[in-house]
Amino acid sequence: MAKYYIFITGGVVSSLGKGITAASLGSVLESRNLKVTLMKLDPYINVNPGTISPIQHGEVFVTEDGAETDLDLGHYERFIKTKMSKKNSFTSGKIYSEVLKNERKGFYLGSTIQVIPHITNEIKKCIINAGKGFDILLVEIGGTVGDIESLPFLESIRQMSIEIGKNKILYIHLTLVPYLKISKEVKTKPTQHSVKELLSIGIQPDILICRSEKNVSKYEKSKIALFCNVPKQAVFSLKNTNSIYKIPILIKKQGLDSYVCDRFCIKRPEADLSKWKEVIYKQKNPLGNVNIGIIGKYTELPDSYRSLISALEHAGLKNRLMINIQLINSKKIESLGISCLKNLHAILIPGGFGYRGVEGKIIAAKYSREKKIPYFGICLGMQVALIEFARNVTGLSEANSTEFINNCKHPVIAKISEWNKSINYLNKSNISSNNYSTMRLGNQKCHLTKGSLAFKIYNNSIILERHRHRYEVNNIFIEKIKFSGLSVSGWAYYDNHKLVEIIEYSNHPWFVGSQFHPEFNSTPRNSHPLFISFVKAAFDFKNKNI
C-alpha cells in the first residue's frame, strides 16, 4: 500500500476541476521528491467509458496497458511523470462486476452479498493495490457529494481512515464559492451545506479548496473555516484561470503542498516548479500563430478531443506558437463543402467510430492533399486519407471501409479477420475483447522505415504508441496503393504478418497518417515529436502562402 492517501471529493456542482486539481497537487508533491500516483473512482455503472458517447462523457483515454479510462487520467499523465494503468481507474460497474464474478465462483462462501461489506471491501482493495510502491496516492472521487451513486465510494474512504489510521489519510473537499455580480460578493452558504452533507456520511474534510471567479478573501476563508470546522490555514482558494498549467504554481504559492507535508510529517525539499514557469512563459509569449482545423463529429464538446487539443498546445509551446484550434463538424463539410476549410494552415482528422460524417472527412483529406495543406490523420483520420487516395489517385473508385459498407467492392479498410484468416495471428496481435467486438488496445511496437519522414521525426527505428481501433488497412490492396505514390513508413509485425501503422505521401510538404494515437503520449513539458513537426509544417505553410 501507499504510505499516505489523499482523497479528493467535490461539492455543490460537478465539473469543478477535481482531476486537474488532483493532478496539479500531485505534480507539486512530485517536485518535492515524493513518489506520487493518482486514481479515479467513477460512480457510473458502465464497466468503463469505452462505449459511452464522447458527447456525454468526453474522450476515452487509453493507458499503455490498454485500459479505456476517463479523460482525467490524461490530465494525470500530463501533470506527473508516473504512467497510469488499468489499476488507476475503476467504476461502479467494474467493482460490481468483480464482486458478482467472485460470488459466482463461490469466493464468499455462501454469504449474502451486500454493498457493505462486499462492495466497500472491493473498493478498498483496489485503492490499496493502486498505491503499492508509492509515497502518496491521490484518489479523485467522481461526481458530487450527495449523489446516491457515490455513497459506496465515500463509505469506503471513510472506513480507510479507521483501518489505516487518520495520520495517513487526508480528505480534501473541492467546492464552489459562487460570485454574485449584482451584489459583488461571494457566497459561502453552498460550501457550508456541501460540507454538512459530507459530515452526514462520516467524513470531516481536512482541507477545503474553494473554486470561484474571484479570490476568496481572508474574511470569507475565516467564515468558511468556522462553519465547516476546519482550521483557517486549511482553507485555500483557486480562482478561474486562463491556463490549467498555472494551477501547480498557484497551489505552491498558497502553500497547499507544505500544509499536506506538515500534516503527514513529511520532510522534503521545497518544490522546484521552474519547468512549469517555463511552460507559462512560453504560453504567454508566443512568437507567432497558426490556424489548425480538427475535423470531427463530436465537436459540440471540446473534451471529446481533450488529449488532441492538449497535444497541439504542447507542440505550440515547443514551437513558440499560439495554436488557434477550429473544431469543424464533418457533417457541415458534407453540406457546405470546402468553404469550411478556408483560412486553415493545417488539417487534422482524429479517431472516431461509425459512418456519420465520414464523407465530410474524406472531402477534407482530398482538399488537404490537393492544396498541399499539412495533413495529420489519426486512427480513422489515417483510414479516410487512405480511402480518399485509393478512390481518387489509385483508381479504386468504390474504395471504402467494411465498417461503413459491409460488401464494398474495394474494402481497403477492414477487420483483420476479413482479409486474413489466421486464428493464431489474431491471438498474437495483442487484441483485447469487449462485449461488442475486438480491438487493438494499448502500447504496440511500430517499426519505422529508414529515410522516411516518420523516421526523421522520431529519430528512431522502433517506437511504442497507444492504439484503440478494430479496423486495419487491408494488406491485399497495399501494393497497388503504394504504386500510386502513397508510402507505408511504419509497420507492426506479428510472427510473419504485418499491419500498416503509418502512411505518408511524398508528393506533399507534410501528409502523415498514423493508426495509433500519439496524443496520449504528449505532455506540456515533453511534447510529442509528431505534433511538433506537424505544427512547424503548419507555420511553414502559413509563411509560404502569405
Curated annotation (Swiss-Prot):
* Binding positions for CTP per the UniProt entry: 14, 147-149, 187-192, 223
Matching CDD domains, A to Z? CTPS_N, GATase1_CTP_Synthase
Coiled coil region boundaries: none
Report the Pfam families cross-referenced here.
Answer: CTP_synth_N (PF06418), GATase (PF00117)
Binding residue positions for ATP: 15-20, 72
Q: Which reaction is the catalytic activity of this chain?
A: UTP + L-glutamine + ATP + H2O = CTP + L-glutamate + ADP + phosphate + 2 H(+); L-glutamine + H2O = L-glutamate + NH4(+); UTP + NH4(+) + ATP = CTP + ADP + phosphate + 2 H(+)
Q: How is its activity regulated?
A: Allosterically activated by GTP, when glutamine is the substrate; GTP has no effect on the reaction when ammonia is the substrate. The allosteric effector GTP functions by stabilizing the protein conformation that binds the tetrahedral intermediate(s) formed during glutamine hydrolysis. Inhibited by the product CTP, via allosteric rather than competitive inhibition.
List residues binding UTP.
14, 187-192, 223
> Does the UniProt entry include the keyword Ligase?
yes
> For L-glutamine, which residues are the binding ones?
352, 380-383, 403, 470
- Known EC number(s)? 6.3.4.2
What's any GO biological process attached to this entry? 'de novo' CTP biosynthetic process
The record's misc note reads:
CTPSs have evolved a hybrid strategy for distinguishing between UTP and CTP. The overlapping regions of the product feedback inhibitory and substrate sites recognize a common feature in both compounds, the triphosphate moiety. To differentiate isosteric substrate and product pyrimidine rings, an additional pocket far from the expected kinase/ligase catalytic site, specifically recognizes the cytosine and ribose portions of the product inhibitor.
Per the record, the similarity remark reads: Belongs to the CTP synthase family.
Q: What is this protein called?
A: CTP synthase
What organism is recorded for this protein? Wigglesworthia glossinidia brevipalpis
